[in-house]
């Protein structure tokens, strides 16, 4: 029958119960207990169990932009081999780890699961403080054995979404003990007496890729301009660009379709052959022109607006104005289209 385990056994409490039982037992039982060390002393030394496959592993899962919201799993398969007669064939498993994978000051939630196919055992969300699960197997099972186990490092669905780009790492230790019996839950006790224990040191890496999404672009509207002749004052408007980036980025705004000269001078809205000058700025005072100076192929060009990114949506205000002193052209609707580029 398949076994799904959720709670580790408590070795200290079990040992107290065992010793109490021995104390209340018959003289023969007490004699057996006292004879055990002599038996072990007289028996040729047993070789300790070994992690004969994958005692040290470093494995990586790399997200893509498409699957960043999905669950991520890294399997760490290993085989514990014990050659001693008294080692036992039943198995216990445990781990020590932290519940997060870390990238500098950033982290993602992580857990460990385990599977022991030979005993139809699956364990979800293992105890992270070394609690032992098991023993799994028969009531009495002496002799050498090899047991295949898979520990899986899991980042739950959605845990990596909105996280900064980089490699998130978790290093953990697993250990497995063998016992000859499942009676009284002797998890780890038999292994401690016979050396039937083995360990593994593993590292899980989860790589979050650089990504940027342009969520919203502005439609800047100066509305109705009613002045006749040169405008007495600057006419202002504004819009918002919203991006979601998990890495440093720069937002550039192109020249538009009618700029006075490439990379310089006023941009211009048009109605047929008529033109209405305007400009786009980074600041509310309208002193820093926002364009593509420095080149859209690099991060940090002087014409753009740069930010380190947070992984969450960020909004940047685009300030627009028609300069004071502008002579208004013939009535009509004037438009221009500019290209917004996010470089990351």
Question: Which residue ranges define each predicted feature?
Answer:
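Outer membrane beta-barrel transmembrane domains
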Residues: 281-285, 295-302
């Amino acid at each position: 029958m398949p076994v799904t385990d959720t709670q580790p056994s408590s070795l200290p409490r079990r040992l107290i119960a065992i010793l109490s039982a021995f104390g209340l037992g018959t003289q023969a039982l007490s004699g057996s207990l006292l004879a055990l060390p002599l038996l072990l002393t007289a028996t040729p030394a047993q070789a300790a169990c070994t992690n004969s496959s994958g005692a040290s592993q470093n494995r990586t899962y790399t997200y893509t932009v498409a699957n960043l919201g999905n669950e991520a799993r890294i399997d760490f398969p290993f085989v514990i081999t014990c050659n001693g007669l008294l080692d036992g064939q039943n198995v216990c498993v445990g781990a020590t780890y932290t519940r997060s994978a870390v990238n500098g000051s950033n982290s993602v939630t992580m857990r460990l699961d385990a599977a022991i196919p030979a005993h139809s055992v699956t364990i979800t969300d293992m105890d992270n403080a070394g609690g032992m699960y098991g023993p799994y197997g028969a009531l009495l099972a002496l002799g050498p054995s090899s047991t295949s186990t898979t520990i899986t490092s899991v980042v739950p669905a959605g845990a990596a979404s909105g996280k900064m780009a980089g490699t998130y790492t978790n290093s953990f230790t697993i250990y497995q003990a063998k016992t000859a019996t499942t009676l009284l839950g002797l998890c780890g006790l038999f292994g401690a007496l016979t050396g039937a224990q083995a360990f593994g040191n593993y590292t899980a890496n989860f790589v979050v890729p650089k990504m940027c999404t342009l969520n919203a672009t502005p439609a800047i509207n100066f509305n109705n301009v009613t002045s006749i002749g040169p405008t007495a004052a600057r006419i202002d408007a504004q819009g918002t660009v919203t991006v979601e980036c998990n890495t440093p980025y720069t937002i550039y705004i192109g020249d538009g379709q009618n700029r006075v000269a490439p990379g310089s001078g006023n941009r211009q809205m048009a109605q047929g052959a008529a033109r209405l000058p305007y400009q786009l700025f980074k600041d509310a005072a309208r002193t820093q022109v926002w364009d593509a100076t420095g080149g859209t192929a690099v991060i940090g060009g002087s014409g753009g607006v740069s930010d380190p990114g947070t992984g969450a949506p960020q909004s940047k205000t685009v300030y627009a104005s028609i300069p004071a002193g502008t002579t208004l052209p013939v009535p009509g609707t004037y438009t221009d289209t500019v290209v917004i580029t996010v470089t990351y």
